[in-house]
UniProtKB/Swiss-Prot annotation:
Gene for this chain: rho
Keyword Transmembrane helix: yes
GO biological process assignments: absorption of visible light; G protein-coupled opsin signaling pathway; visual perception
Topology term for the membrane: Multi-pass membrane protein
Residue numbers covered by motif 'Ionic lock' involved in activated form stabilization: 105-107
Known glycosylation sites: N171
Pfam families linked to this entry: 7tm_1
Family indicated by similarity: Belongs to the G-protein coupled receptor 1 family. Opsin subfamily.
Disulfide bond entries: C81-C158
Keywords: Cell projection, Chromophore, Disulfide bond, G-protein coupled receptor, Glycoprotein, Lipoprotein, Membrane, Palmitate, Phosphoprotein, Photoreceptor protein, Receptor, Retinal protein, Sensory transduction, Transducer, Transmembrane, Transmembrane helix, Vision
Name by which UniProt lists this protein: Rhodopsin
Function: Photoreceptor required for image-forming vision at low light intensity. While most salt water fish species use retinal as chromophore, most freshwater fish use 3-dehydroretinal, or a mixture of retinal and 3-dehydroretinal. Light-induced isomerization of 11-cis to all-trans retinal triggers a conformational change that activates signaling via G-proteins. Subsequent receptor phosphorylation mediates displacement of the bound G-protein alpha subunit by arrestin and terminates signaling.
Organism (species): Batrachocottus multiradiatus (Baikal sculpin)
Site (Plays an important role in the conformation switch to the active conformation): E84
Length: 289
């Protein structure tokens, strides 16, 4: 054991809790959407994609981590490490880029930078395809030699190799690519789109002399923006910051928990996403009931 058995027990219990909550909520999202025709709208296709991404993380990542935590190390070998790392990365990236597509959709529909544009089913499918392509450009390279997946932290889950400059894997270039394309860019897009969305609501409220309806709309959008931004940062910023520090300070001494804690903070969107995008949607709530 790299740390005390109690830490592995706590990790296993945490993963069990994520599975216990994340699987039924995301599965329910899929079921309700497929069951109720009125929910099959272009916007909800993106929400459905989030649920699929979260299920990838739950079934492909969380279950494996819970199992390996019972043994105190990653017992599934190189193939198991590649599969766990791939599915966990794929699910997280699909969710991340789905949030970007959703932010762009909200900006275009509400702020109308393109006059007479209507978000259609074809646009939604293009957005979904984009999210999958971007996710695969992050999750596949470590399987084919551009970087690699290795056990990290407490050695119960696998992630991209930020830790070494292993010869032949070009870890440095892949990590730099990840930290340019797969973190600041999506974060900047989300901030820009929701910032413009909030400004548009404020302008509409001012033009209508702060009517009760527009005040309520401004409040709802403000709350959604705050939740989105905080949720994104809380989940991803600790992991990205620690991973970048490790990459820049390879060879430095740090304990296994140093990387374990932020990596499992980043797994919480499997619970956050349905809460933010589904439970705050009245139509979804009514259909679930």
């Amino acid at each position: 054991y790299l740390v005390s058995p109690a830490a592995y027990a706590a990790l296993g219990a945490y993963m069990f809790l994520l599975i216990l909550i994340g699987f039924p909520v995301n599965f329910l999202t899929l079921y309700v959407t497929l069951e109720h025709k009125k929910l099959r709208t272009p916007l909800n296709y993106i929400l459905l994609n989030l649920a699929v991404a979260d299920l990838f993380m739950v079934l492909g990542g969380f279950t494996t981590t819970m199992y390996t935590s019972m043994h105190g190390y990653f017992v599934l070998g190189r193939l198991g490490c590649n599969l766990e790392g791939f599915f966990a990365t794929l699910g997280g990236e699909i969710a991340l880029w789905s949030l970007v597509v959703l932010a762009i959709e909200r900006w275009i529909v509400v702020c109308k930078p393109i006059s007479n544009f209507r978000f259609t089913e074809d646009n939604a499918i293009m957005g979904l395809a984009f999210s999958w392509v971007m996710a695969l450009t992050c999750a596949v390279p470590p399987l084919v030699g551009w970087s690699r997946y290795i056990p990290e932290g407490m050695q119960c889950s696998c992630g991209v190799d930020y830790y070494t400059r292993a010869e032949g894997f070009n870890n440095e270039s892949f990590v730099i690519y990840m930290f340019i394309v797969h973190f600041p860019i999506p974060l900047s897009v989300i901030f820009f789109c929701y910032g413009r969305l909030l400004c548009a609501v404020k302008e509409a409220a001012a033009a209508q002399q702060e009517s009760e309806t527009t005040q309520r709309a401004e409040k709802e959008v403000s709350r959604m923006v705050v939740i989105l931004v905080i949720g994104f940062l809380v989940c991803w910023l600790p992991y990205a910051s620690v991973a970048w520090w490790i990459f820049c300070n390879q060879g430095s001494d740090f304990g296994p928990i140093f990387m374990t804690l932020p990596s499992f903070f980043a797994k919480r969107p499997a619970i956050y996403n349905p809460m933010i995008y589904i439970c705050m949607n009245k139509q979804f709530r009514h259909c679930m009931i």
